Amino acid sequence: MLTIVQEALTFDDVLLLPAYSTVLPKDVSLKTRLTRGIYLNIPLVSAAMDTVTESRMAIAMAQNGGIGILHKNMDIAAQAAEVRRVKKFEAGMVKDPITVSPETTVRELIAITSANNISGVPVVKDSKVVGIVTGRDTRFETNLEQPVSNIMTGQDRLVTVREGESKENIQALLQKHRIEKVLVVGESNELKGLITVTDFRKAESYPNSCKDDLGRLRVGAAVGTGADTPSRVEALVEAGVDVIVVDTAHGHSAGVIERVRWVKQNFPQVQVIGGNIATGDAALALLDAGADAVKVGIGPGSICTTRIVAGIGMPQISAIDSVASALKDQIPLIADGGIPFSGDMAKAIGAGASTIMVGSLLAGTEEAPGEVEFFQGRYYKAYRGMGSLGAMAGRTGSADRYFQDSKAGAEKLVPEGIEGRVPYKGPMGNIVHQMMGGLRSSMGYTGSAVIEDLRQNAKFVKITSAGMSESHVHDVTITKEAPNYRVG
């Protein structure tokens, strides 16, 4: 018997109604919850795709106030290294800096600094700071077998600060002594941390950046349900990851639910997101397993073919509403996929999402992985679904997401995505600016001062295809493309 559960709607089927407003777009707050314990300064998350998010994109996302989720289509060590790159890129204070002893040779020091991409190393003896050695000390040194004690800045010239010193005083000290690094010490001259002028400059350049309690940029990472997942999670947690995303095509499955439960039981300090799902029942199952947020979206992405190949899914607006209605604000939900315009972000939030995950919007940007290609007079970058043959073949991370065996050979894989190219878009910051500007406009139209106002108070109208045609540009030839509007 044919059972029709409900009529389902997506972004082009609805419009938000304007409301009385005293709110100006420039005055709204875009701060929102990613999970139970993590807040973002903008409601934007970059997708865990191998043509969208690696460390460079994750750094840029966090600097702009969002967060990037590192894809898992790489081995464990490589993914953990990507996490470390993000966490080490900026730090209010490096809590556990790499150190050397006075007896360490210059050759050994150079090897350490090269391997860890650092330029200044504290010199410690019996847990006490005795000096610091920087790139200036080693740059023209020819005797590589001598100890660093011969070339370091010793205690008599060493500039240090006590733990808890104000940012203003530290900046004044750096400027007064014309130095780029200062050591933080305790009452007995024991090393507490390292502060660099570079981190101050980064913080000033990106005042809206999303950081943890130690002043480091936040980053997430995707894992699956395969046999190597426990080792992968352990390595990611050790590297300092802020959030683990148990990322599969079908989040309402026993393996995903048990993996979410396992991560929360073994690493309770780490936030866990489960997905992808499209129903309220799935959301409640993941909530019961301990998920700190859920990810909603089966098949809405521009490169996803799940709805056609498997005949499975739910139009995204209805999926978001179904999950939000079931969760009743106990944990946040992330709307994942099908977002070509900033107005769709506003619709997703109005339907119940707290954050938006995007892939195609950020694919083709300078920060996205991959080389720029020249084709028929235009520049492009590759973009593919994680369910495409290219992503799954020979890479266990992506095949695992779709519950398939990459070792079976490409001819045995059943793809649920395609491979393609998108125009090169330049720096991602320009796109984020336009998308968040559109969201601000929507909040102004609806009288929403904060994201939660839009989530709770939005009202929709259902429209026809004629209504959507009327909404788009019509009866005119575009002569100059707008930065936030592209059709086709």
From Swiss-Prot:
One of its GO terms (biological process) is GMP biosynthetic process. NAD(+) binds at residues 247, 297-299. Mycophenolic acid (MPA) is a non-competitive inhibitor that prevents formation of the closed enzyme conformation by binding to the same site as the amobile flap. In contrast, mizoribine monophosphate (MZP) is a competitive inhibitor that induces the closed conformation. MPA is a potent inhibitor of mammalian IMPDHs but a poor inhibitor of the bacterial enzymes. MZP is a more potent inhibitor of bacterial IMPDH. It holds the Pfam family IMPDH. This is Inosine-5'-monophosphate dehydrogenase. SUPFAM superfamilies: CBS-domain pair, Inosine monophosphate dehydrogenase (IMPDH). It catalyses: IMP + NAD(+) + H2O = XMP + NADH + H(+).
